[in-house]
Amino acid sequence: MIISWYGFNYFKLKNTSHSLIFNPYGLDKVSKFSKAKADLILFSDPNQIAKAKLNKDAFIVDSPGEYEVNDIFVYGREIKNNIIYYVVFEGIKIAFLGEFGHDDLANGDLELIEGADILILPVGGGDLTTSKEASKIIQQVEPRVVIPSCHKAGSGKLKADNIADFVKEFGVKPEEEEKYKIKKKDLPQEDVKLIILKTQK
């Protein structure tokens, strides 16, 4: 599986057969994205669908529930107008927190994503999760890989904290990647890995 980041909260996951996209939109009213092409497109905020350019054949998920598309399993739960997702793709468990704010994860929410292999979560503060809050969530979920989103490097004109603030708070040496390629058998078994992705054009 290859994970790519296109800025803010826009991620694409793909293998040789299928693909999945999270949140193909920006919130700064300036960022422009090309048409999102994937088998499955997930939205944390259904109100943003109108802003996104989507291929007509994609299966769109914009509400909580359970879904299965091309052997990709999706579980969505709404928390204060934001849908968090738990996805199983190629046997890898991915927790995606979308535009999660300053709330604590309730027990039921934590049960959904606890033990995920990969955790993608905002770290840039503002209306979204701060570095300190993100670090607490990571301790609760205990993922093997952490991928930060919504930090200054990919947020366009939005005000957001630098990724360096999160790195300092989290205390794990990061690995910077253009794209993150991972197979289930290669997931780290002991120490958590922090992956900082560069934005794709």
List each language-model region with its residue ranges.
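Active-site-proximal loop/helix segments of hydrolase catalytic cores
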Residues: 80-141
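Divalent metal-coordination and catalytic microenvironments
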Residues: 13, 41, 74, 99, ...
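Zn-dependent metallo-beta-lactamase
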Residues: 1-16, 28, 61-70, 188-201
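Conserved beta-strand hairpin/beta-sheet module of binuclear metal-dependent hydrolase folds
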Residues: 1-29, 79-98, 118
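Binuclear metal-ion centers of metallo-dependent hydrolases, dominated by the metallo-beta-lactamase
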Residues: 2-6, 145-201
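Portal/gating segments that form or line small-molecule/metal binding sites
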Residues: 51-95
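Active-site metal-binding motif and surrounding structural segment of the metallo-beta-lactamase
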Residues: 27-66, 110-120, 124
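Active-site metal-binding loops of divalent metal-dependent hydrolases
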Residues: 24-26, 46-47, 79, 97-102, ...
